[in-house]
Regions:
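Flexible glycan-contacting loops in extracellular carbohydrate-active proteins
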Residues: 119-145
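Short, aromatic/His-centered strand-loop micro-motif at the edge of beta-sheets
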Residues: 70-96
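Extracellular structured ligand-interaction cores
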Residues: 32, 94-96, 105, 133, ...
Length: 156
């Protein structure tokens, strides 16, 4: 199961992909990743939960910086580092996730199953984003449960 958090997401700014992504959510009913990375200006943190016998894929935590103005799709959007085979996520286990974006630094903290780990991503090589919406996305063929979802903004 792949889950994605979009942080400060905005549209590309051209019709129909106006800055406020809520205004074109109908266009995202068909789950095509290219609809997101070609038309959203955003930070993205994703994590994959494995453990499905029919899949031989590594568990991962990674981040990207979507930049539709570059017109390169996903090419060159990776934030470093990437974390593979963390051993964290197990199917059926509840986790508490905390995401922090400060300036061009992204953090993801995972607590659960007796573990507490924090992951860091450096976005300083990319244009900074300072406004936009927060969004969730997951593979449409999978299930995840979300509870107590909150967004905070710190005063400067």
């Amino acid at each position: 199961c792949v889950n994605i958090l979009y942080i400060q997401a905005q549209g590309a700014g051209r019709k129909p992909f106006v800055k406020d992504i809520f205004k074109w959510n109908e266009l995202r009913k068909v789950p095509r990743m290219s609809m997101y990375f070609n038309n959203m200006d955003t930070y993205h943190i994703s994590y994959a939960v494995t453990g499905v016998a029919s899949e031989d894929k590594p568990e991962y935590i990674r981040a990207r910086r979507y930049m539709p103005q570059w017109e390169k799709g996903l090419e060159g959007t990776e934030l470093k580092p990437e974390y593979l085979n963390t051993g964290l996520f197990k199917i059926g286990v509840t986790y508490h996730l905390t995401f922090i974006k400060y300036e061009t630094n992204l953090y993801m903290n995972v607590k659960g199953d007796g573990q507490d780990k924090t992951f860091y991503f450096d976005a300083s090589a990319f244009p900074k984003i300072d406004k936009g919406r927060v969004g969730l996305r997951q593979m449409y063929t999978r299930n995840s449960k979300y509870a107590n979802f909150r967004v905070y903004q710190l005063d400067k």
